[in-house]
Amino acid sequence: MKSAAFIPLWERKNGICRSESLMFDGEGRAKLLFPASKILKLCNPTLGKVYSEGRDFTHTPGSDELRLVPGSAIPFLTEAMIHPDPATAKLYPHPEADAIADSVNGRPVIFSNGDFFARTQVEADYQTAGIVEFPELPRLAPGQLPRITAKLREKKPVKLLLIGDSISEGYNATGYLKVPPFMPPYIDLFASGLTERSGGPVTAVNRAVNGTGCRHARKEPERWAGEEADLLVIAYGMNDFGGMEPAEYASVIREIMELRLGRFPETEFILVGSMPRNLNWGSLPEGRAEAFVGALRGLESEKAAAADVCALWTRVQAGKDYYSMTGNGVNHPNDYGHRLYAEVLLGLFA
């Protein structure tokens, strides 16, 4: 997929947040991650719409909340839309599914593998108010991933290889959906961000497969194990949360790493801890994503680093809501979510 410049979630030096995703609720409210002194821009790039303060929304300086004006052109999501009527809902795996079964309250929950959320969410640029404590990102330990860090420092070509599930394949980035603003999936943002920072060429090959868990990579190594690359990014979890315990997950990931090292002994690894699912959907207990990240940390070494997407996702979601960050309603990121993934990966090399 065509690469695009990585847009940081926030600019720490000047306190500006860029293209932060928002979803207005049925009461006409949307939450910013931080209090804002000024809204610089509010838009929906998929619809090609720019919204005006006063005409479409209001904001009180110093507040983290936006409110819709009566008659506003801004889309919103009501409770009735989140839980559609079971009699009329098209349930997944219907090809035109607009809902999925198995929500925690027994009612269908909104679902879309198309561009519904891209057309309904909006993006805000804003100046934060006062002193803001932006989330800290995990970094490599001293001496970790020495081969790739040396190649980046020396501006030598670097090749990334990604294996994972539908999130990593690209769902529901607008570039993957082929709708504006055509934001690439996170692996391409990661590669372009490394290129910009290092000044050397960084390319990415994506071998992720929709619907798979980590056992798939172990079962079908011919899809990825023979591909030459400096860094193997392993990003499973979402489809493993319900089918295995963290210890088995770690064991399978270790086997994947050993398969790779048997062919390319110099390979280094990033082990991605998945975003959590929508807790309004499914029967799994809370904390599964966090437990699986903990299992990955047990695999860290000089040649392998964990990238804890779950922690940053949870921190951001706590200040907003899941529907501002999701691309399908239940377990995929939107453009903002893909940027968040890339932010965590790039943060390792800061």
Where are these regions (language model features)?
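Short, solvent-exposed loop/turn segments at secondary-structure boundaries
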Residues: 173-179, 243-248, 281-287
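Extended beta-strand solenoid/passenger and fiber regions
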Residues: 1-136
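Catalytic-core regions of hydrolytic enzymes
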Residues: 174, 200, 207-231, 241-254
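Serine-esterase "nucleophile elbow" of acetyl-processing enzymes
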Residues: 131-206, 220-228
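Solvent-exposed loop/turn segments at secondary-structure junctions
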Residues: 166-170, 209-215, 238-243, 275-279, ...
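Catalytic His-Asp segment of secreted/periplasmic serine-dependent ester chemistry enzymes
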Residues: 274-350
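Structural recognition of the beta-strand scaffold that forms the well-ordered cores
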Residues: 159-164, 168-169, 203-208, 230-236, ...
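Active-site segments of SGNH/GDSL-like serine hydrolases
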Residues: 235-239, 259-292
